A protein has these predicted regions:
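N-terminal Rossmann-fold NAD(P) dinucleotide-binding loop
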Residues: 52
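Glycine-rich FAD pyrophosphate-binding loop
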Residues: 60-81
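N-terminal FAD cofactor-binding segment of flavoenzymes
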Residues: 78-121
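Beta1/beta-strand and adjacent pyrophosphate-binding region of the FAD-binding site
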Residues: 37-49
């Protein structure tokens, strides 16, 4: 057992010395001579995008003598859905990868998360209820063009001495154990097929999750969280901070001093939400995520037409997208978003990023998840290359990942789509979810990147306590949403309200004030709806419930 910052972290005793010696993992050091290096490469990374390139960068910075091969399928990274980061990923990019200059010069700084609600009384966009910050955020967060970021990171990895094979297709691989792995891949330019040996294989193949599917450890979470997404890009979008946008938002335009257009704007509804992310190109990434138990988006037309039809049913969406044009052949659809793997590491291999699993994009924590998995793999490999036995660490990492995944899911996302369309409930959830995020994960990674990125969130005694508290209020909010449906008051506060955050969330215990405020709103709702039965089988439309809209609401 090792004590770091008065925090108890349980690691195998034979790795304790290495942890104490690697408080700064970026300090270059020699490889141990205690292992066989007769393989062709010390490490082969399958996938050269964010997770694969990041892992290679961190390993080469610490062990410059490592022979690393990165196999990337594409000749050039394609345009991907625009991504928004939250504060943990912002810390990873700026303080761990140390690409802050690139992020600030090539991507858009994010002005927080902003949610927009409406009901049948919302006759103008300016009457839409808004949840979000009144000022700019204090910590670095970004609206990311993934094609640009992935390209930059792979170039950095190559400049550090990593060999890159692209475009190349992985034909097969054999997980023979540490120092006994083989992988066969084909160059798509010369047509040459190569088989190489590797000390370790890193799976950074994203949702393809090659190792998990090969080992049959990939698991869908569709039985508990049947969400899907479709998205596209639009040009000629009316920004909320433009002259036309400000005029349309008359009545609320002066209440926010930050630029709304640089927030990640979410349009909210029962069983669904839409993201709106500005990109450096001037285009806008737009998508919808929905719970198929509750909602189905419009069915007719192309994907872009279906998405635009839905957007125009929301007053704020209509302002922004009425004259917008979809970018041709630039849309995607994913069914059953949530999945996980029983194993994230083993004898001579490790998975990172989306190859480990994915939950939900609502709070933009996808790269948080990637950051922790990348750093966990780094910690494992640096122990190995420093000469320590990692058998017990492998067992620990697999246990930690699974428990963290479900603690995280139950705390934030289980059945949450029941109350996404109610501004009053989401106001309480916003304060509680983000308040606990700053008190826990954000505070910890800004205090000690090395130990905290190594650990998965919501794990350990304190993490479990917060996860249980969050899962409890999440369950209560689901029940309260059903009670509101019965009472005919679901969405009653979706017009003419401004739930603005006028004091910043800070990565310290001062953010408890937001948690306390959220609890007060919650308890008032419990008292008001104490004797109201919860709806069971179906939405019961009322004047205040925004039904119908584009798409179809389903029996729940």
């Amino acid at each position: 057992m090792v004590i770091l910052r008065k925090t108890l972290i349980f690691y195998p005793t034979n790795s304790a010395q290495s942890i104490m010696q690697t408080i700064n993992p970026r300090s270059p050091r020699p490889l141990s001579t205690s292992f066989d290096r007769s393989v062709d490469y010390d490490i082969v990374v399958m996938g050269g995008a964010f997770s694969g390139a990041s892992n290679a960068i961190l390993l080469k910075r610490e062990f410059p003598d490592l022979r690393i091969l990165i196999i990337e399928r594409t000749e050039a990274f394609s345009r991907k859905v625009g991504e928004s980061t939250s504060e943990v990923a912002g810390c990873f990019l700026s303080r761990v990868l140390r690409v802050g200059m690139h992020m600030n010069s090539k991507h858009i700084s994010k002005h927080g998360l902003r949610m927009w609600f409406h009901n049948e009384e919302t006759t103008t966009p300016g009457r839409s209820t808004e949840i979000g910050p009144a000022y700019q955020g204090r910590l670095p967060t970004f609206q990311i063009n993934r094609m640009t970021l992935d390209t930059e990171l792979l170039l950095i990895a190559e400049s550090l001495g990593c060999e890159v094979a692209r475009p190349a297709t992985i034909k097969e691989f054999d997980l023979g154990g540490i120092g006994k792995n083989t992988i066969t891949f084909k160059s798509e330019t010369g047509g040459e097929t190569r088989t190489v040996t590797a000390g370790w294989l890193i799976d950074a193949t994203g949702k393809a999750a090659k190792i998990a599917k090969e080992r049959k450890t990939w698991r869908s979470l569709a039985d508990q969280h049947p969400t899907s997404s479709m998205w596209t890009r639009f040009r000629n979008v009316t920004y909320l901070d433009s002259d036309e946008g400000m005029r349309e938002l008359d009545g609320v335009s002066s209440t926010v001093l930050a630029q709304r257009g640089f927030s990640t704007n979410h349009l909210m509804g029962f069983g669904w939400w839409c993201w709106i992310i500005p990109l450096d190109s001037g285009e806008v990434s737009v998508g919808i995520t929905w719970d198929s138990r509750l909602f189905t988006p419009p069915a007719n037309g192309t994907m872009s037409e279906r998405l635009k039809e839905h957007l125009l049913k929301h007053p704020v969406g209509k302002v922004m997208f009425e004259n917008a044009e979809a970018v041709e052949n630039d849309n995607q659809y994913y069914k059953s978003l949530a999945y996980w793997s029983d194993e994230v590491t083993g004898d001579g291999w490790a998975a990172v990023g989306d190859a480990c699993g994915f939950m939900d994009p609502l709070y933009s924590q996808g790269l948080d998840y990637c950051a922790h998995s990348i750093y966990g793999a780094l910690a494992l490999l640096r122990d190995h290359y420093a000469g320590y036995c990692v058998k017990d660490t492998i067992v620990h990492r697999n246990q930690e990942f699974k428990r963290s995944y479900f603690n995280w899911f139950n705390a934030l996302y289980k059945d949450k789509y029941w109350y996404l369309g109610d501004a009053e409930l989401m106001h309480a959830a916003f304060l509680l979810d983000i308040g606990t995020y700053f008190i826990g994960p954000v505070r910890l990674v800004y205090t000690d990147q090395d130990s905290e990125f190594t650990r998965m969130p919501y794990y350990g005694p304190t993490g479990r306590f917060f996860a249980r508290f969050m899962a409890f209020y999440n369950r209560r909010f689901v029940t309260l949403a059903k009670k509101k449906i019965t009472a005919g008051t679901y969405g009653a506060m979706n017009s003419d309200q401004a739930f603005l955050i006028t004091k910043s969330f800070n990565p310290d215990f001062s953010s408890f004030k937001f948690v306390i405020k959220g609890i007060k709103i919650w308890l008032k709702l419990e008292a008001r709806l104490a004797f109201t039965p919860a709806a069971q089988d179906a939405m019961q439309p009322s004047v205040a419930t925004p039904l119908p809209q584009a798409g179809q609401y389903r029996h729940a």
